[in-house]
């Protein structure tokens, strides 16, 4: 299996060198790092090439790396039922970059790209209807970004007196604690109640 994926990686790199930045194999799947501008062309090639035949788009998602200059990885998961292989394409983009849509190659990408836009704020050029999919029309921010507050900005509830849905600022029962997610986690300096292991030392 690994040998077949290695052969496939070499073939794709040889046939489309302008698209492939690098590739590796992890968890039984071929991972290819792609230039964002070339993603649509590479996906089309992978669909029609007889050695590939990745005709099924399984998913499009993104990963947020706030410490990087190219903050997001847009990740495409493709399946070849003919070759019984999976492939993962990764395109690293800055926050303000736009990624070409692949709706013309895989119509099912329509909702996947809308979800990525809604959750991460990544824009897709050439998308026929790029609007929010999972959040409300007036929603502020993008919930899967790591800098989005866990409480959100507003809460929604039905007001019986007004007979309509109302938006209100978030009111917390306890004071909001801001955590620095970029720092390594450190435990308490003191022994916690009920921690018999520490007392036995």
From Swiss-Prot:
Q: Which GO terms describe its cellular component?
A: plasma membrane
Q: Where in the cell is it found?
A: Cell inner membrane
**Disulphide bonds in the chain:** none
Q: What InterPro entries does UniProt report for this protein, alphabetically? A: NADH_DH_suC, NADH_quin_OxRdtase_su_C/D-like, NADH_UbQ_OxRdtase_30kDa_su, NADH_UbQ_OxRdtase_CS
Recorded topology in the membrane: Peripheral membrane protein
> Which EC class is the enzyme in?
translocase
Keywords, comma-separated and alphabetical: Cell inner membrane, Cell membrane, Membrane, NAD, Quinone, Translocase, Transport, Ubiquinone
* Catalysed reaction equations from the record: a quinone + NADH + 5 H(+)(in) = a quinol + NAD(+) + 4 H(+)(out)
The UniProt record lists the keyword Cell membrane: yes
Gene Ontology MF annotations? NADH dehydrogenase (ubiquinone) activity; NADH:ubiquinone reductase (non-electrogenic) activity; quinone binding
Q: What is its EC number?
A: 7.1.1.-
Describe the function of this protein.
NDH-1 shuttles electrons from NADH, via FMN and iron-sulfur (Fe-S) centers, to quinones in the respiratory chain. The immediate electron acceptor for the enzyme in this species is believed to be ubiquinone. Couples the redox reaction to proton translocation (for every two electrons transferred, four hydrogen ions are translocated across the cytoplasmic membrane), and thus conserves the redox energy in a proton gradient.
The protein's matches in NCBIfam families, at most eight in alphabetical order, are given as: NuoC_fam, PRK06074.1-5
Annotated HAMAP family = NDH1_NuoC
Which family is it part of? Belongs to the complex I 30 kDa subunit family.
Q: Quaternary form?
A: NDH-1 is composed of 14 different subunits. Subunits NuoB, C, D, E, F, and G constitute the peripheral sector of the complex.
Task: Specify the protein name.
Answer: NADH-quinone oxidoreductase subunit C
Q: Which organism is it from?
A: Ruegeria sp. (strain TM1040)
